[in-house]
Amino acid sequence: MALPQMCDGSHLASTLRYCMTVSGTVVLVAGTLCFAWWSEGDATAQPGQLAPPTEYPVPEGPSPLLRSVSFVCCGAGGLLLLIGLLWSVKASIPGPPRWDPYHLSRDLYYLTVESSEKESCRTPKVVDIPTYEEAVSFPVAEGPPTPPAYPTEEALEPSGSRDALLSTQPAWPPPSYESISLALDAVSAETTPSATRSCSGLVQTARGGS
């Protein structure tokens, strides 16, 4: 919508400028011819010349109206021609660029894209590798940072009771095969005499009854 209006305005200005230049030139030429005409008439009517013969009429001098018309035409034509020429020169000089939101947004987009590409293409920073002496004297902490230590339930218990429980529960070694076999032999040895004594007691009671 704005582009057709701009084209119409520039076309109208160029047409008006052309008309002013042409009309000023025509009026100036007409005034110059009028000036030359009455100047020639004044030259023919100068006193001191010989009187013409009686059969030829004496030419009359130019009227004051013709002089005023010639002066007005010369002045107006020169003014119009000067304005038209100055306007043409001013129009031919390129002015400052007009603000265009489309071009401005496009320039900003290209600017941001170029700046991001330049930042991505930058060389990485060079890290100084420490020497052996620096590494020994200033050890570098490796690994992730340790989380803050929070008190647990075990830490909240009194240390005295925990030590007492540990002292009352001796650490027994795990049973071996030899210890298990010895325990079984001892149990079998204890049960065998009692069984024989009970059997002999039953035999004696049976004999006494008979």
UniProtKB/Swiss-Prot annotation:
It is found in: Membrane. The chain crosses the membrane at residues 18-38, 69-89. GO terms for cellular component: membrane. InterPro entries: TMEM61 (IPR028164). It comes from the Eukaryota. It is a multi-pass membrane protein. Pfam families: TMEM61 (PF15105). Keywords: Membrane, Transmembrane, Transmembrane helix. Residues 140-172 are annotated as: Disordered. This is Transmembrane protein 61. It comes from Homo sapiens (Human).
